[in-house]
Amino acid sequence: AYLGGTVNNAVITVPAYFNDSQRQATKDAGLIAGLNVLRIINEPTAAAIAYGLDKKTEGERNVLIFDLGGGTFDVSLLTIEEGIFEVKSTAGDTHLGGEDFDNRLVNHFVNEFKRKHKKDLTTNARALRRLRTACERAKRTLSSAAQTSIEIDSLFEGIDFYTSITRARFEELCQDLFRGTMEPVERVLRDAKIDKSSVHEIVLVGGSTRIPKIQKLVSDFFNKDANKSINPDEAVAYGAAVQAAILSGDTSSKSTNEILLLDVAPLSLGIETAGGVMTPLIKRNTTIPTKKSETFSTYSDNQPGVLIQVFEGERARTKDNNLLGKFELTGIPPAPRGVPQIEVTFDLDANGIMNVSASEKGTGKSNKITITNDKGRLSKEEIERMLAEAEKYKAEDEAEASRIQAKNGLESYAYSLKNTITEGKLQMSDDDKKKIEDKISEIISWLDNNQTAEKDEYESQQKELEAIANPIMQAAYGAAGGAPPQQRADGETEEKKDEEELD
């Protein structure tokens, strides 16, 4: 409804540090919502697309995307050359963002309240919620002002809480968190084997990059100003929209022509070999989509089968990495250890989702897996069940939505009519005024007692109200030399038009 049409296909962005399981879960969620997910792309990569369109330059440019949002933090280093984007390295923290800065403020004021009033705010969830809302507002204000005040009436046990905080105090409270954002920046540069002096542009993305201290830390580290020309809240969505246009074949915009996007695997992917060793097939920061094969053999004589265990992570031992899935390849003919040739292939698609296969070259026996057994992942059967449920209850859901729409329409019409009459700007007789007011009161009273009525009952009530109100209101507007506001007829036509487009 927001876009005025049906949305079938989507490009969905995820934090660069999302693992395989989280990416698949995101794709599953899109499928359940009725979307054909064309591509899952990293948020910093999406921001880079937006940046690439804004800044067309000759030659290769190294761009660092610093994305600090409400709950996650991502840093990516990209090269952009002649419309080709390549992610060289990524790093970050999935649990750092604006909420953590809010928490520091909340804790600070909880302690202040305890000092002043000898009361513990943490025992009251509502008081904490009100304080958190005020803290978030204060944090935003401190991005443009040197100090701000917090005023909350009757915060806890009837006590009003009036206080203030300076930007300097806020920066001190969050000092370790702010400085901690530099570590992933250094790691990204190390991984990409690029010196900070070789970074041509720094792009700030995410609402939390509006904090002046964050901007200063970044500019001091690189000894140059960060690029803030892109709206930090819109950059990712802008880039995703451009990618969607490319994937759907829309080349109507000159900007979307000749752009090639190369994403990377955020973590190394490999299998367990003898002794619990992690043997990577796809190294971290490999450009995707990619396909890698490697040949392995048996560990003992006459071994009838092998267990292929797939892991992601950077640790040398598999026990320290994340198990994605496993499967067995059986039917290997008896042979001395080291003789059978088992080819393992990792096929990682553009969405970061992987198919793993293994085949024994001598017999041609093979087996494969699309990783599905991780906790964060839905099986095909579960997805089908959820889709079936959505289809099963579709008619009921639509009927309920239609009923609520009729109820809201009647309520809005009655109250707007009441407000128009109360303002007293229209000339009408006392009898006419009383007639409408009585009917409005009757309708409002009926609404209060019939919150679960059927759609046709609401429509019937609205027709009754219109039958009385419309002639009187038209006469009143005519006398005032104006036109009455468009009431239900136009609104209903508009709704029907939208519904036809949606179908």
Swiss-Prot record:
Q: Where is this region: Disordered?
A: 475-503
Check the record and name the InterPro entries matching this protein: ATPase_NBD, Heat_shock_70_CS, HSP70_C_sf, HSP70_peptide-bd_sf, Hsp_70_fam
Which protein family is named in the record?
Belongs to the heat shock protein 70 family.
For whether the record's keyword set contains Endoplasmic reticulum, the answer is no
* Gene3D superfamilies listed in its UniProt record: 1.20.1270.10, 3.30.420.40, Actin, Chain A, domain 4, Substrate Binding Domain Of DNAk, Chain A, domain 1
UniProt feature, compositional bias: Low complexity: 475-488
Q: Does the keyword Signal apply?
A: no
UniProt keyword terms in alphabetical order = Allergen, ATP-binding, Chaperone, Nucleotide-binding, Stress response
Gene symbol here is: HSP70
Name under which the protein is recorded: Heat shock 70 kDa protein
Q: Which domain of life is it from?
A: Eukaryota
One GO MF term: ATP binding
PROSITE patterns from the UniProt entry: HSP70_2 (PS00329), HSP70_3 (PS01036)
